[in-house]
């Protein structure tokens, strides 16, 4: 148990699973077409540039994260480095982004469910399904972080099975002729493609909010970040290779993985990919609920929100008040359908969060010369 009253139940591989869950989200089922439409086969080069960029950001998070063991993640890093005002801004923006992200994915979930059961996309069935998602994940989170972590483990494996199947089978059906490079894209188009990829890979910072519930966070966080993001980059790159090599009209595809899989898995392909999308979205929703509900708790512990939000359930050792408040906000936004405007703030928020953590690194190094489990390139 931590000084905050929380229980450290997230193990090393639990954290890896949670990070993969939030990184390999619903975007992977549309990403190949979006990137291909922007830069054609140079999308593979964009992946390499993105991998290097995300890798540098992740290493900054790994080193900074190895210096903290309490709940808060980037919010806590900003508070320690820049003071309470900047931290409050980072914390609130992160919370709003996660709430909007959950609302968005809940809508995507019912859209994919509509592939199997069309009534799910509108009316009372839609409302019931979204409410059931929120209630179920709220109950799981209140019952204990151990339960949430185990759910994350199960859905990470379930999410990866169809994607690994897609790659493992699809690689045998690719046509080398489809990898011919056309005219080199302009800097603007290439930058846009890299931005799309970086945005899709983002989200890992949210899981670090739960540092107060991670076992040996100073050592586990760097390991989990490097393993999870490396695995995600390789998986995304291989999926792009299969899509390019098996789907002639990739740039114009609305459901690239489903259409590509049909060419080598037959009619079962789209069903497997759609089911995989449902599983993947649910897993991501679980991670978002786990992360966003801890931010108000962390801010309350630091005295920046009402103290009631810092209450911990006596039996389950979870921040139940913060969970209920966040879940209520998620439910209202998801049911209102107006979330689409709120989602636009996520890009700005992530730039602020990434920048604040990267800038915090050299400052924290100067203040504290203690050796850390991981160290990025640069002078102390």
What are these regions (language model features)?
Residues 1-33, 37-42, 46, 55, ...:
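Membrane-interface "cap" regions at the ends of multi-pass membrane proteins
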Residues 151, 184, 308-320, 354-380:
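C-terminal membrane-solvent junction of multi-pass transporters and transport-like membrane proteins
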Residues 38-41, 69-71, 80-86, 212-220, ...:
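Juxtamembrane helix-boundary/capping and inter-helix hinge elements in multi-pass membrane proteins
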Residues 14-19, 98-101, 316-325, 376-380:
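Select subsegments of transmembrane alpha-helices in polytopic membrane proteins
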């Amino acid at each position: 148990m931590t000084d905050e009253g929380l229980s450290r139940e997230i193990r090393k591989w639990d954290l890896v699973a949670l990070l993969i869950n939030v990184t390999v989200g619903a975007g992977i089922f549309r990403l190949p077409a979006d990137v291909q439409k922007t830069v054609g086969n140079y999308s593979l080069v964009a992946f390499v540039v993105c991998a290097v960029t995300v890798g540098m950001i992740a290493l900054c998070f790994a080193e900074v994260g190895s210096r903290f063991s309490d709940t808060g993640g980037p919010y806590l890093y900003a508070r320690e480095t820049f003071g309470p005002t900047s931290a409050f801004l980072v914390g609130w923006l992160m919370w709003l982004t996660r709430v909007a992200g959950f609302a968005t994915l809940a809508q995507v979930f019912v859209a994919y469910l509509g592939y199997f059961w069309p009534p799910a996309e509108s009316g009372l069935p839609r409302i019931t399904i979204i409410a059931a998602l929120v209630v179920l994940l709220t109950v799981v989170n209140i019952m204990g972080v151990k339960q949430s972590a185990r759910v994350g483990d199960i859905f990470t494996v379930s999410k990866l099975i169809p994607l690994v199947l897609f790659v493992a089978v699809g690689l045998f059906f690719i046509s080398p002729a489809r990898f011919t490079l056309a005219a080199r894209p302009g800097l603007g188009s290439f930058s846009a493609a890299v931005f799309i990829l970086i945005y899709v890979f983002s989200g890992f910072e949210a899981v670090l909010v739960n540092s107060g519930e991670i076992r040996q966070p100073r050592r586990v966080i760097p390991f989990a970040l490097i393993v999870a993001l490396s695995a995600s980059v390789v998986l995304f790159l291989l999926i792009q290779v299969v899509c390019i090599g098996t789907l002639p009209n990739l740039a114009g595809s609305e459901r690239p993985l489903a259409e590509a899989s049909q060419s080598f898995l037959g009619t079962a392909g789209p069903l497997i990919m759609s089911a995989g999308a449902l599983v993947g979205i649910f897993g991501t929703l679980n991670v978002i609920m786990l992360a966003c509900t801890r931010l108000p708790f962390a801010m309350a512990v630091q005295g920046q929100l009402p103290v009631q939000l810092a209450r911990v359930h006596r039996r389950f050792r979870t921040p139940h008040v913060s969970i209920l408040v966040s879940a209520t906000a998620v439910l209202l936004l998801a049911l209102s359908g107006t979330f689409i405007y709120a989602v636009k703030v996520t890009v700005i928020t992530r730039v602020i969060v990434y920048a604040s953590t990267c800038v915090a690194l050299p400052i924290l190094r100067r203040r504290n010369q203690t050796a850390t489990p991981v160290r990025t390139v640069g002078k102390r």
